[in-house]
């Protein structure tokens, strides 16, 4: 049976429509392909290309029918494409999917369809068709970007969270590697440095774990070569203040919970020999309630092992006298002997840095808006285990760089200056941001608002804004922008908290928000915080919300003055 060509084109048209609906209305986190894929990010080129294919197939379908002229078919197809594009935007708005009714996308749809439909007219009306085509091509050149480059953002996260960055900590120059990469990105964007080579140096004390990290529980006085060692990062980690030990061997001494309630038990423990003190995280949290003499005796133990429900690493500026490990409770199997080796090195005055760049304002360059994110993480634990830190905070750095790319474009040059601050040593206790506040590269009274970006790789459940209950008027403005554009499912205000780099600025009187997304991956300060775990479901929304909020504070491009006046 012979199938006519126009039926084939009709089938292909309907198939393409089904594919478009699937891609535009499927939540990003449920798609089998990463949402960083350009087609799913729906930037201008993607929209135009998708609708160009739709218009071409539709025109061939209608043109194959009897009585349909090429011009009439082109007109019907163009109107249908505009209507279909509008329908998609309405559905995205109602279903809270995709980019939530970015109507600039409809312009891209029309441009793509229009360019393809002009092709059949080139032979008969070449000059007119070329003129219209040139006009359509010129339209996007003056349009401001409406979304981040999600593919580029995901690549940024993947680079920063890669093994080559050594966890962006203080073993094997991890944070210096990350800083070198970010200097290159700032330079490529054409941002002006706020310090030589974008770098503000400072130093800190930090406890590190660069070498051996071994733990084994068995009944033999020797390490058992055929019995697997517990895996660092997966089954145990070093406590941040752990001291070193080489090939230690001791018996476990599980802490009796009666020491917290029975004075006789507490007194008996003051005279008991303690090998490896084994206690739960709940017991450890209550140690300060014990008699001082018993606390001192427990501190003299050969080693500490704390059983925890989840491994959550952190950093410290001090070092205990003995090794202290945190072991996943579900992986702990008590035996008669414990073998351990911990290479711990306390680095004094370790040299590190903040990075600082600026886009100078066109109207009020001495007034500043600040976008900040910390680029450091927890580094390594042993010679092989590293903490990727994809969500914390490669995601925030990626969003900062996307906003920097936006404001670096000449057509988006802000009225106020916009500073981009990449802080080091946040995980060590807000060291980098505190140093900046004490040694500011821009006058703190000239900062109109600071937006700190941290933990922005998810977003299925919206975002929380720390200090939203402090700066209520600014939070209402943020909420109004989010409601108008449906950037994120919801925004939640929170009070002040010393949980990221906004805090030293807030304490110094600088208005500041710290925004982080919720939902999705629960990995935090562990080896599972990897790029593949991040949906980036709220990344584009957080970008749009941050951009619009900063524009409202003074980052919106200044109006071009009429030279005739």
Residue ranges with predicted function:
Residues 141-193, 359-361, 365-366:
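N-terminal hydrophobic or amphipathic helices/low-complexity stretches enriched
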Residues 145-147, 163-173, 201-203, 254-256, ...:
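Second-shell loop/turn segments in exported
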Residues 405, 522-565:
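His/Asp/Glu-rich mid-to-C-terminal helical/loop segments that flank catalytic regions of hydrolases
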Residues 1-142:
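Bulky hydrophobic segments
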Residues 243-247, 255, 260, 307-389, ...:
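Soluble metallo-hydrolase cores and metallopeptidase-like ectodomains found primarily
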Residues 166-281:
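Noncatalytic luminal/extracellular "stalk/propeptide" segments of secretory-pathway proteins
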Residues 423-520:
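Metal-dependent peptidase/peptidase-like ectodomains
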């Amino acid at each position: 049976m012979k199938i006519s060509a126009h039926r084939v084109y009709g089938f292909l048209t309907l198939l393409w429509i089904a594919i478009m609906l699937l891609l535009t209305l499927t939540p990003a986190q449920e798609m089998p392909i990463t949402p960083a894929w350009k087609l799913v990010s729906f930037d201008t080129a993607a929209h135009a290309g998708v609708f160009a294919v739709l218009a071409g197939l539709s025109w061939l379908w209608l043109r194959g029918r009897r009585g349909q002229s090429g011009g009439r078919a082109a007109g019907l197809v163009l109107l249908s494409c505009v209507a279909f594009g509008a329908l998609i935007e309405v559905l995205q708005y109602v279903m809270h999917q995709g980019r939530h009714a970015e109507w600039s996308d409809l312009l891209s749809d029309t441009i793509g369809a229009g360019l393809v439909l002009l092709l059949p007219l080139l032979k008969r009306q070449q000059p007119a068709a070329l003129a219209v085509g040139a006009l359509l091509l010129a339209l996007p050149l003056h349009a401001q970007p409406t979304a981040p480059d999600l593919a580029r953002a995901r690549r940024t996260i993947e680079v920063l969270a890669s093994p080559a960055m050594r966890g962006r900590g203080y073993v094997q120059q991890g944070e210096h590697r990350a800083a070198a990469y970010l200097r290159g990105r700032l330079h490529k964007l054409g941002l002006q440095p706020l310090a030589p080579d974008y770098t503000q140096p400072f130093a800190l004390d930090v406890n590190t774990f660069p070498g051996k990290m071994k733990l084994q529980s068995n009944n033999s006085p020797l390490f058992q070569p055929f019995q697997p060692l517990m895996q660092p990062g997966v089954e145990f980690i070093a406590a941040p203040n752990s001291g070193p030990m080489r090939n230690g061997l001791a018996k476990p001494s599980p802490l009796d919970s009666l020491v917290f309630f029975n004075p006789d038990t507490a007194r008996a423990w003051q005279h008991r020999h303690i090998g490896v003190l084994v206690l739960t995280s709940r017991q450890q949290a209550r140690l300060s309630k014990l008699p001082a003499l018993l606390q001192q005796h427990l501190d003299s133990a050969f080693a500490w092992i704390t059983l925890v429900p989840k491994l959550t690493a952190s950093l410290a500026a001090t070092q205990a006298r003995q090794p202290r490990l945190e072991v996943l409770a579900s992986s702990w199997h008590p035996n008669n002997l414990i073998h351990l080796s911990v290479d711990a090195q306390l680095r004094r005055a370790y040299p590190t840095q903040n990075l600082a760049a600026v886009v100078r304002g066109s109207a009020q360059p001495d007034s500043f808006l600040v976008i900040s994110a910390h680029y450091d993480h927890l580094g390594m634990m042993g010679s092989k285990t590293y903490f990727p830190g994809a969500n914390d905070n490669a995601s925030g750095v990626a969003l900062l760089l996307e906003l920097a790319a936006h404001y670096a474009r000449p057509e988006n040059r802000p009225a106020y200056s916009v500073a981009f601050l990449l802080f080091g040593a946040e995980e060590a206790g807000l060291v980098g941001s505190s140093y900046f506040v004490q040694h500011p590269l821009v006058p703190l009274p000239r900062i109109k608002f600071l937006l700190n970006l941290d933990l922005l790789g998810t977003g299925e459940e919206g975002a929380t804004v720390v200090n939203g209950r402090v700066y209520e008027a600014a939070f209402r403005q943020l909420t109004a922008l989010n409601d108008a554009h449906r950037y994120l499912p919801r925004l939640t205000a929170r009070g002040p908290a010393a949980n990221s780099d906004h805090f030293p600025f807030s304490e110094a009187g600088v208005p500041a928000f710290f925004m982080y997304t919720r939902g999705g991956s629960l990995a935090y300060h562990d080896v599972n915080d990897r790029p593949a775990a991040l949906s980036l479901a709220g990344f584009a929304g957080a970008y749009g919300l941050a951009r619009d909020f900063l524009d409202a504070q003074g980052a919106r491009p200044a109006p071009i003055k009429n030279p005739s006046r």
